[in-house]
Each structure stands twice: as structure tokens, then as C-alpha cells.
Amino acid sequence: MIQGTTSDAGKSTLVAGLCRLARRTGARVAPFKPQNMALNSAVTANGGEIGRAQALQALAAGIEAHTDLNPVLLKPTGDRGAQVIIHGTARANLDARAYHDYKPTAMRAVLESYGRLRGAYDAVIVEGAGSPAEINLREGDIANMGFAEAVDCPVVLVADIDRGGVFAHLVGTLACLSDSERARVRGFVINRFRGDPALLEPGLRWLEARTGKPVLGVLPYLHGLTLDAEDMLPASARTSAARRDAGVLRIVVPALPRISNHTDFDALRAHPRVDFTYWKRGPVPDADLLILPGSKNVLADLAWLRDAGWDALIKRHLRYGGKVIGICGGMQMLGRTLADPHGVEGAAGATSAGLGLLDYATTLTPEKTLVNAAGRLAFGGDARVAGYEIHMGRTEGPALASPALMLAGRGGERPDGAVSADGQILATYLHGLFDTPHACAALLEWAGLDGAEALDYPALREASLERLADTFAEHLDLDRVFAAFA
């Protein structure tokens, strides 16, 4: 089991790289995260929902993503509550106290999934969540040492040296563990190191002498990886185009407080002719294309957009000929009204005017749509698209008569989304809209980028997984790492 001294220490990436290395040996290996809290999720082939990081790890392992890889997924709906997803299905919205009482039920689901994986694969590489040293979360823990103790799982502890204080993080984490938990830790991995490794040697010797545990590797800081993020927005809010000789498209996406599935924009951030910005505060940069992203709380995020002046900004942008895309929750915001009669996102009966840019209305419903989908753009040369839908809502209205996409359905094609009569606004429920090379190029051309190249994002992601595995093979003591899991 890979545990970390902090969130974002590198657990997900380490598991992905180890899965790819194990796959190279011919072993059948599965990633596993007992409990994940994230707003980036993926749809499995069996119609469930798991954390996006586990879908990436499944890709690294060469297996199909399924709900046993992440049996408990928590999707925050606000500062104190989350939607609880068990074995891929949404069960309830619970606040922190209610979820604490629910943990025994969640743990049973975790152990069921882990047992099935152990029986089906040669090895299971487990990822913890956050830090095992959160004293206030120790009782009833199912994500870190509570799980490791329950199944007698050895642990490797990873820490991020780029943040500073790596030795304090490692020694301090061990100090917060019980005797049996400390004994379970087989060694350390230090992540994101920059500079001369020889200068780190005195610290490594001190750490090993102080703790009696080996350092299993020091991983360098890897720039330019194209891998799906588990949850956090990228540290850099802006990426600049690598090529400017043939023109550049400027894209701005508001960093909504409850933004979900922002992996939708990874292909755009990697495109050599796109200037991409996540807007968080201050003046909004000039843009050719504004994209409203998915949201786990559409009504609250729409109110936030209005408070930030985006309703007027979008209308001004359109008057000057700009383009707008709304994806999932962003699509719902673009319509006339939003209603929450069942209290899916908050108080039952809440309603709000939408931005009023497309003639349809959305009603939030307790039933969640979870489906992988493929089809074509309904304009611009019928470029193929592939992605997934994750939403709790039904949208109806005249604007849907001019769909954005035609997706494969039972007995033929089904329409999705809408394109405005003037061709300036596109709305869709499909996540992953830009991941398919020719669809990405067609959409960038629609937004104003002449001669847009087709960027093969899946190939970039695959190359990053290979680079990750090569780096781990060079910088980890793999014999000791895999011996720790024996």
C-alpha cells in the first residue's frame, strides 16, 4: 500500500507507475483505492463511477476500469457534505458526522471489493488517501492504516520534497502512528527532487538511522507529464501556446468552487496553439473561447459566477463575436432555468434563472446518468467524439432541436446538447469532448483557430505513463519495493 505524508505527495502517480512496471513483467495487477474524495471521476464499463485517478491507474495496468478499483467515492457538494458513492452508485448526500456513522457500511464495501481483486489478480497495489497521521480521522479509518491493519497490508510512505520539510514530514508521520502501524511501514520514497542527489545523501543516511527504515528511492521532478489529475486544479493556472507562428486561440475557463471533471481541458492545455487560463480572480483575460465547466453544485456555482460578473461578461463576449461552450453543469447554466425539486444539491424546491442564452430548462433529479458514449459532432464535418456522461438532471426545450452531437444509442443515434442559431454557443453533457483528436481540431476551428492541428491526447497520456515507468525503473530500488509488497 502506498501512503503519503500529505495530500498530493505523489501517491496516485506512484501507483500508476508501479502498475505499468508490473504490467511489463507480465503480471496481472490491479490498482485499488479504498476511499477517494474527488470531483474528477470516470464511468466504468459496468456503468458505475470511480475516481479519475483509478481509471488512469487501470489504463497503466492494462485492465478495464471497474467499480471494485474504488469502492467508496466521496464527491463534495459543499464545505461540510458530500455525495457518497458505493460500488459505483450514489447512495446518499451526507455531512461529515453522518458519514462517520456510515463508515462501518463503507468498510464492508471496501473489504468486499478488495477480496474480489485479490482473487482475480496476481497483485493489488493499494493507494491511501491524504495522510495516515490525521489524528482526528483515525477512529473508523477505512482509507489508510485502518484498512492496512484490517487486511495485513505492508505500507510504503511517500513524501514530496519540493514542498520543503520532507524529513519532518516522514519522521512526524511515523511519530503519529501506533506501534503496529509503524511496524507496517517498510520504507520511504522521496518524490519530486530537483538538483544533485549527492547533496541529499547526508539527510537520507540520517533518516534511515533515525527511523530504522530504508529509503527505497528518490524520484526526480518530472516536467511535462500529461496525466489525469485526481482532483486538484493544476498548480499553474495558465499554459501558453508553444507555437505562435500559425496563430493562437485564447481559452478561459472559470475555476468554479465546485468544478468537476476538469480533466476535460487537459487536451487543450497540451495543445501547441492554445493559450489556456483557469480564471480565479481579478480581471478576466481576453478570450476567443469561454468554457463553462462541469460542477458538483450547479446552483451554487451559478450564483458564484453571477457575483463575479460573468453573466454580463459572457454576453459582452458574444456581442463581439466570441464563442462559448458549456459542458455538463456548464450546459445547464446556459439555459433559461434550473430547478431542484428533490433537494439534489441543497434545499428541496430551490430554483434559479439560468444565463438565458439557450432556450431550455433543467430539472435536477435524484437519478444519476452514468454512461460512456461515442458518436460525432453534428456540425463541422462529422468528426468522431468519445467520452462519458455523469449528471443528475434532465434538460428539455426548443434549443435541443439543433444538437451539438449525435451519439450512438439503441437502434441508432441520439441527439445531445445544443448549438445556438447564430453558431456562437455550444452546449453538451459529454465529458471528454476534446480528447478525440479530430473532434478537438474541429472544435478549435469552430472557435476561430484556422488550420487547427489534431492533437492525439490519448497518445500523449500513454507516452507519459511509459516515461513514468522508465523513470521509476531507474530511480527506485524495485527489488526492495516489490519485496515490500511480497
From Swiss-Prot:
The keyword Ligase does not apply. GO terms for biological process: cobalamin biosynthetic process. Gene3D superfamilies: 3.40.50.880, P-loop containing nucleotide triphosphate hydrolases. The active site is at residues 328, 431. The keyword Cytoplasm does not apply. Pathway: Cofactor biosynthesis; adenosylcobalamin biosynthesis. Residues 248-439 form the GATase cobBQ-type domain. It comes from the Bacteria. Keywords: Cobalamin biosynthesis, Glutamine amidotransferase. GO terms for molecular function: ABC-type vitamin B12 transporter activity; catalytic activity. Belongs to the CobB/CobQ family. CobQ subfamily. HAMAP family: CobQ. Catalyzes amidations at positions B, D, E, and G on adenosylcobyrinic A,C-diamide. NH(2) groups are provided by glutamine, and one molecule of ATP is hydrogenolyzed for each amidation. PANTHER family: COBYRIC ACID SYNTHASE, DETHIOBIOTIN SYNTHETASE. This is Cobyric acid synthase. It comes from Burkholderia mallei (strain ATCC 23344).
